[in-house]
């Protein structure tokens, strides 16, 4: 080997050359990415050209309009100005079409377009690919497999379990309540609905409302809600690598771990129980099957059982959707009744006439409270638990007014905007339960608290039963009053929440 080959003075030059090549490659990749984003932006501009929208910045999109946190108010102004639909630009090369017209909703919900993976994929580390995130034939197989878990015969015994969970919460409130102070109800209602899911879907013994470990799961779900919403709107956090290295990414990872620890514990306890109980027919003779039993005994069309990954995804999905959405619904229903005492009073009279002292409620009672049901539905109209859902068009679509979209466009079905659309609901901000009176006519897709079409909420009957039980048992024990100093600040997350909580004053009735 020559001396010159070992000469260290030549190394800096070689290193410099490598750095130059790396720099050029990096610049080339950057230019290619910029060109890709530019071409995608031009495609979006052409795709959405039939749909007017407010002016937007070439890079920041409409983000400036939503900086003050009044997203829902801004959106409702758009609803009044732009008929049926309006594009929203998140940033330079990302946009989706907001729709809020029942005819538009009917068209999209009648199709089999997949969920908009651009945003929904951020949920996968938390809830996996269960019924919420699956698409196509796999989704269809899982939906058909899970449907028996929501049959009326299975739902009937749940009413007593729901009532037990509600009474535990109300007993707690009775100890906390005073005439001069208010109570933040969302946290307690979240624990109650988690308790209900654990008892009904997973046959949990005892009450998670009395278990401090359950608080960490509720906190993790709240954190994941906020982190998902924040990530969707952060251009730098679209990259999984960058997000994992960020403080928010690390917090999300820890919250996912806490959520998974909870669901894994539930699954392992049931597997151990089934090993002792034996085969399906033996279990069925001993007790009723619940949601988790259906999953563990289920067979896919090819005869195989669910994988552990699929099993946890369905449990995580139902654990979240089955408690957080109903907690949102119940909390906002209570707020709506607190701010409309005349309707609250009429509901209470109806319930007292049906239940007497309210000591017990049964399946048969649920269809015998028409006015209370009307008020529940009106509260769900004003405060839909799920503000919107997204679809990515798998084929071109033409709407009834002749406007069209090509394949690939993301469409956001804004349930909140639909429910507040003055062309659909006259005086939409006024609490009026009478449009929901039995026999009243309305567009089939004007009211969508549980979405619609083949991908509607599989647990909607379970949820409605729980809402009725919670409202009925609460109104016979408490009068609900608003706290004028703490008006809720609505925030659209995965579910509709309040940034400052939902504070109510409670007055004991008995």
From Swiss-Prot:
Fetch the InterPro entries from UniProt.
Answer: Cyt_P450 (IPR001128), Cyt_P450_CS (IPR017972), Cyt_P450_E_grp-I (IPR002401), Cyt_P450_sf (IPR036396), Cytochrome_P450_Monoox (IPR050196)
Family matches, as Pfam families = p450
Enzyme Commission numbers on file: 1.14.14.80
Induction of the gene = P450 can be induced to high levels in liver and other tissues by various foreign compounds, including drugs, pesticides, and carcinogens.
Membrane topology of this protein = Peripheral membrane protein
Q: Does the keyword Membrane apply?
A: yes
Q: Give any GO molecular function from the UniProt entry.
A: long-chain fatty acid omega-hydroxylase activity
One biological process GO term for this chain?
lipid metabolic process
Localization in the cell:
Endoplasmic reticulum membrane; Microsome membrane
Task: Look up the record and name the cofactor or cofactors this protein needs.
Answer: heme
Reported tissue expression: Liver; kidney.
Chain residues in the propeptide: 1-4
Q: Where does heme bind?
A: 321, 457
Q: What reactions does this protein catalyze?
A: an omega-methyl-long-chain fatty acid + reduced [NADPH--hemoprotein reductase] + O2 = an omega-hydroxy-long-chain fatty acid + oxidized [NADPH--hemoprotein reductase] + H2O + H(+)
Keywords from the UniProt entry: Endoplasmic reticulum, Heme, Iron, Membrane, Metal-binding, Microsome, Monooxygenase, NADP, Oxidoreductase
Q: What SUPFAM superfamilies does this protein map onto?
A: Cytochrome P450
Answer whether the UniProt record assigns the keyword Secreted to this protein.
Answer: no
Q: Which PROSITE patterns match?
A: CYTOCHROME_P450 (PS00086)
May I have one GO cellular component term? endoplasmic reticulum membrane
**Its biological function?**
Cytochromes P450 are a group of heme-thiolate monooxygenases. In liver microsomes, this enzyme is involved in an NADPH-dependent electron transport pathway. It oxidizes a variety of structurally unrelated compounds, including steroids, fatty acids, and xenobiotics.
| Family label | Belongs to the cytochrome P450 family.
Supply the name of the protein.
Cytochrome P450 4A6
């Amino acid at each position: 080997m020559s001396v010159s080959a070992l000469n260290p003075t030549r190394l800096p030059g070689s290193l410099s050359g490598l750095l130059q090549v790396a720099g050029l490659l990096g610049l080339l990749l950057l230019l290619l990415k910029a060109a890709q984003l530019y071409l995608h932006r031009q495609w979006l501009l052409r795709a959405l050209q039939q749909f007017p929208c407010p002016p937007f910045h070439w890079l920041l999109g409409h983000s400036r309009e939503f900086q003050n946190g009044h997203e829902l108010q801004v959106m409702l102004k758009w609803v009044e100005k732009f008929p049926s639909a309006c594009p929203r630009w998140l940033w330079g090369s990302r946009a989706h079409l907001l729709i809020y017209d029942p005819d538009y909703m009917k068209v999209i919900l009648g199709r089999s377009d997949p969920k908009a993976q651009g945003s929904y994929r951020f949920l996968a580390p938390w809830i996996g690919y269960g019924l919420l995130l699956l698409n196509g034939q796999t989704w269809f197989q899982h939906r058909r497999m899970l449907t028996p878990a929501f049959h009326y015969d299975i739902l009937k015994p749940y009413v007593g379990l729901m009532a037990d969970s509600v009474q535990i919460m109300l007993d707690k409130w009775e100890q906390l309540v005073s005439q001069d102070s208010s109570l933040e109800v969302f946290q307690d209602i979240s624990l109650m609905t988690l308790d209900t899911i654990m008892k009904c879907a997973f046959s949990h013994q005892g009450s998670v409302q009395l278990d401090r470990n359950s608080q960490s799961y509720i906190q993790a779900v709240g954190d994941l809600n906020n982190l998902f919403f924040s990530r969707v709107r952060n251009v730098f956090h679209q990259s999984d690598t960058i997000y994992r290295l960020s403080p928010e990414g690390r917090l999300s990872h820890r919250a996912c771990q806490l959520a998974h620890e909870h669901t894994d514990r539930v699954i392992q306890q049931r597997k151990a129980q089934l090993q002792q109980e034996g085969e399906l027919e033996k279990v069925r003779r001993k007790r009723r099957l619940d949601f988790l039993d259906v999953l563990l005994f289920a067979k896919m069309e090819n005869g195989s059982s669910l994988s552990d990954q699929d099993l946890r995804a369905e449990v995580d999905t139902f654990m979240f959707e089955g408690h957080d959405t109903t907690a949102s619904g119940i909390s906002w229903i209570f707020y709506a009744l607190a701010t409309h005492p005349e309707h609250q009073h009429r509901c209470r009279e109806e319930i007292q006439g049906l239940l007497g002292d309210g000591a017990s409620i049964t399946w048969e009672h649920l269809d015998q409270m028409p006015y209370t049901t009307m008020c529940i539905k009106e509260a769900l109209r004003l405060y839909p638990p799920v503000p919107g859902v997204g679809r990515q068009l798998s084929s071109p679509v033409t709407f009834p007014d002749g406007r069209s979209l090509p394949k690939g466009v993301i469409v956001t079905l804004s349930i909140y905007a639909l429910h507040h659309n003055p062309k659909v609901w006259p005086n939409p901000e006024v609490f009026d339960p009478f449009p929901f009176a039995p026999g009243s006519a309305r567009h089939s897709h004007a009211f969508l608290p549980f979405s619609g079409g083949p991908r509607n909420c599989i647990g909607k009957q379970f949820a409605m039963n729980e809402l009725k039980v919670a409202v009925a048992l609460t109104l016979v024990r408490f009068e609900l009053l608003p706290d004028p100093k703490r008006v809720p600040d609505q925030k659209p997350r995965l579910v509709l929440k309040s940034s400052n909580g939902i504070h109510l004053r409670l007055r004991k009735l008995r």
